[in-house]
Regions:
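Short, low-complexity disordered leader/linker segments with a strong preference
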Residues: 1-78, 177
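Extracytoplasmic/periplasmic ligand-capture domains
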Residues: 18-41, 54, 108-110, 123, ...
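N-terminal lobe/hinge region of extracytoplasmic solute-binding protein
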Residues: 48, 54-126, 157, 259-260
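Edge beta-strand plus adjacent loop/short-helix module at the start
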Residues: 104, 144, 230-259
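Extracytoplasmic/periplasmic substrate-binding proteins
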Residues: 105-113, 211-214, 220, 274-279
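Surface-exposed binding/hinge segments that line
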Residues: 170-243
């Protein structure tokens, strides 16, 4: 019997910042406690022997020990140690739905703390102007090339701050510079306090590190511009910026050429199918020394703007996993499919305080409407007039939590009053 897993994301009726601290009141009791803590390493757990998937046998690869970092990070499985093998079938509306990302820092499962990932250690100065990061020794890109400080500095200097590629840089990097300390240690330094920068690293850090050894071949800071323009034309792009943007794309145009740090690398891509296979140099292991991931390959069918088709495939067991395209209104259909024993349906509360926000136009051309919208009494009355409990019952089957667009209860900034 084929087993599939589906998550339906249920919303609340009233987005919150990822929290940086707090208690453990929001931890899911079914999840491993290790998901909320700083991950341990192989040496800390006494792991000295490593294994990899038979899928990689017969390939011209170094031994698994030489493909892993010096002291790999240990990831605990959800319920039990997995078995190697298999190909998972999923769907993509775009590949942002397949969060196959790796960044220097990540966020704990309860959204309360920053945790190390590519980084072994990090520190933010007391004045919030300097963030120093030390990455784990021995992490490698999917082509076997070592990850170093140069990769992070390249991205900051030649992607984020390049005036051609990024004419309008993010406000979170303005006034900043990246400095190399050694091959594994670097720092970001800002003219003014920038305490939110570490949050950027944890949330979108996948876009803060690129393989310099690949992209330097396509950047005018490293290649003669005339020669580069000719090569870019041969690739079918109008500029080097367009080419690099396409290569860095994490959606359904994701490139199979670019080395990655992720668990899966793109094997092939067509308009209707993305095929991934395991990264032989992936840097994490499980508690018994198995190199992750467990699943060898993923076939992701590209289905754009057709939630009904995704629901039909999911409810009839044609997929192994589905989540983002499923809607709350699909729960009854999915529950019918669950009765056959072919699929499991899990309802997962999302960390948003609202799907819909009514925002008044305070600059409306009609003066009377503008005055009305600016009147806080009108806005309060409008809020009171929205029957959130009724919406919750009709639209969300009573699974939502009626509330205002405010701070999420998991946030360190949440106050009950």
């Amino acid at each position: 019997m084929r087993s599939a897993l589906f998550f339906v994301v249920v919303v609340t009726l009233a987005p919150a910042s990822n929290a940086e601290g707090g208690d453990s009141t929001h931890q899911d009791k079914d999840w491993p406690k290790e998901w909320y803590e700083t991950p341990r390493t192989a040496s800390e757990m006494g792991i000295t022997e490593y294994r990899d998937s038979p899928f990689l046998r017969g390939r011209d690869l170094p031994p698994v020990k030489d493909r892993l970092p010096d002291d790999p990070q240990v990831i605990h499985p959800y319920k039990e140690i997995g078995k190697y093998g298999g190909k998972a079938k999923i769907t993509l509306g775009d590949s942002w739905q397949f969060f196959n990302w790796e960044s220097a820092l990540t966020i704990s499962a309860d959204m309360q703390n920053f945790l190390p990932n590519l980084a072994r250690h990090w520190e933010v100065s007391a004045d919030g102007r300097t963030t120093t990061i030390e990455i784990r020794r021995g992490i490698k890109w999917s082509d076997g090339h070592p990850l170093t400080s140069d990769d992070f500095i390249f991205t900051f200097d030649h992607i984020w701050l390049d005036k051609e590629y990024s004419p309008v840089p993010s406000r979170l990097i303005l006034g900043g510079r990246a400095e190399k300390i050694d091959d594994l240690t670097f720092r970001y330094v800002f003219e003014d306090p920038n305490p939110q920068f570490v949050n950027l690293i944890a949330q979108y850090g996948n876009f803060m590190v690129d393989p310099k050894h690949y992209f330097r071949n396509w950047h005018p800071s490293f290649v003669d511009r005339e020669e580069l323009n000719e090569r870019i034309k041969e690739k079918g792009f109008i500029s080097w910026m367009a080419f690099i943007d396409a290569q860095r794309n994490a959606r359904i145009e994701e490139s199979a050429e670019v080395p990655t740090l992720r668990a899966y690398k793109v094997l092939s891509r067509t308009p209707t199918m993305m095929r991934y296979e395991r990264n032989p140099y992936y840097h994490k292991i499980d508690p018994v020394g198995n190199q992750l991931p467990y699943i060898d390959a993923i076939d992701a069918e590209v289905i754009l703007d057709n939630a009904e088709l995704v629901t039909a495939k999911a409810s009839t067991g044609q997929l192994d996993f589905a989540a983002f395209a499923l809607r709350t209104q699909d729960i009854p259909i999915l529950k019918l499919g669950e009765r056959t024993g072919e699929i499991d349906v899990n309802v997962w509360t999302r960390l948003h305080t609202s799907d819909v926000v009514i925002q008044m136009n305070f600059n409306h051309p009609d003066q009377k409407l503008r005055e009305l919208y600016l009147d806080v009494r009108f806005r309060r009355a409008l809020s009171y007039a929205i029957n959130r409990p009724e919406m919750n019952e009709i639209i969300y089957f009573g699974r939502g939590t009626p509330q205002q667009v405010s701070v999420h209860p998991t946030s360190m900034y949440y106050e009950e009053k």
